[in-house]
UniProtKB/Swiss-Prot annotation:
Keywords assigned: Mitochondrion, Transit peptide
Stated name of the protein: Protein MMF1, mitochondrial
Domain of life: Eukaryota
PANTHER family per UniProt: 2-IMINOBUTANOATE/2-IMINOPROPANOATE DEAMINASE RIDA, PROTEIN HMF1-RELATED
Remarks, miscellaneous: Present with 168000 molecules/cell in log phase SD medium.
Keyword flag Magnesium: no
Transit peptide per record: 1-17
């Protein structure tokens, strides 16, 4: 809490310009694996938590990085649809790979989904990921107008 113009205010006022924070949840993507939301909407921005290659019924996808990446994209699409957004509205993508040897194969799937619209992206090799998966992807998007 702090004083502003001699009126006691609570912390949410510090979120200048952000008037609404809304958690997003859909049964068309796997449930959160810990204490977090599948996504959060802040005004017209959608922040999608890292999606891993699990099906909506919470089963791990077996197979190639391509197959796993397709499931991750489907999860992201479903969460964005629930948020009034889509892949075409993505501003930034963060990709985490447990083995950078999978980069080319992952990138071929990525390119299929982003052929004309190319959001900013980072791809990072990491030592490990939750539930021992080899791929995780998080995105920031805007809502459709």
């Amino acid at each position: 809490m702090f004083l502003r113009n001699s009126v006691l205010r609570t912390a949410p006022v510090l979120r200048r310009g952000i008037t609404t924070l809304t958690p997003v949840s859909t049964k068309l993507a796997p449930p959160a694996a810990a204490s977090y939301s599948q996504a959060m909407k802040a005004n017209n921005f959608v922040y999608v938590s890292g999606q891993i290659p699990y099906t909506p019924d919470n089963k791990p996808v077996q197979g190639s990085i391509s197959e796993k990446a397709e499931q991750v994209f489907q999860n992201v699409k479903n969460i964005l649809a629930e948020s009034n957004s889509s892949l075409d509205n993505i501003v930034k993508v963060n990709v985490f790979l447990a083995d950078m040897k999978n980069f080319a194969e992952f990138n071929s799937v990525y390119a299929k989904h982003f052929h004309t619209h190319k959001p900013a992206r980072s791809c990072v090799g990491v030592a490990s990921l939750p539930l021992n998966v080899d791929l995780e992807m998080e995105v920031i998007a805007v809502e459709k107008n």
